[in-house]
Amino acid sequence: NVVALCADLIGSLKMDQFIKENPERFFQIGIAEANMMGIAAGLTIGGKIPFAGTFAEFATARVYDQIRQSIAYSNKNVKIAASHAGLTLGEDGATHQTLEDIGLMKMLPGMVVINPCDYNQTKAATIAAAEYEGPVYLRFGRPAVPVFTPADQKFEIGKGILMNEGTDVTIVATGHLVWESLVAAAELEK
């Protein structure tokens, strides 16, 4: 029942393999993010589990009304896959950057926000999101980060993971910045 929708970013979102293997489960919406959210909400009525993919800025601020009205308030089983989050799209300028997306999405009723830190956690989080009944905002950064979580790690929605133990400083991070926090912790240990 999983289907994918894209707002004209197949290459940037690395959707080629899914489309090749499942062309009948893919919908190219074009540069029409607001329509994509409405279509995704509608697909849930027929039992589909839509993953709507675009850049984080376009998946939140640009379409907030549609998400609020058509997805969150009605508790639709839509998964919003938002890539290139934060300042990771520097070369594309401020119009493509978002820092407020987590806050915007956390304010919505019933919306679950997931911000995985590496490939293994992203894979596990995506599976957990698909299995979860209700709206989910999956947030991904753009930078390549090393794979540092176990491949068999179970992802639990709403639960943090202790990556390192120490006695002097607590560092809290989310998403692709978890790797940077581990690097910083190693430096502080010296």
Where are these regions (language model features)?
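Thiamine diphosphate
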Residues: 1-139, 144, 154
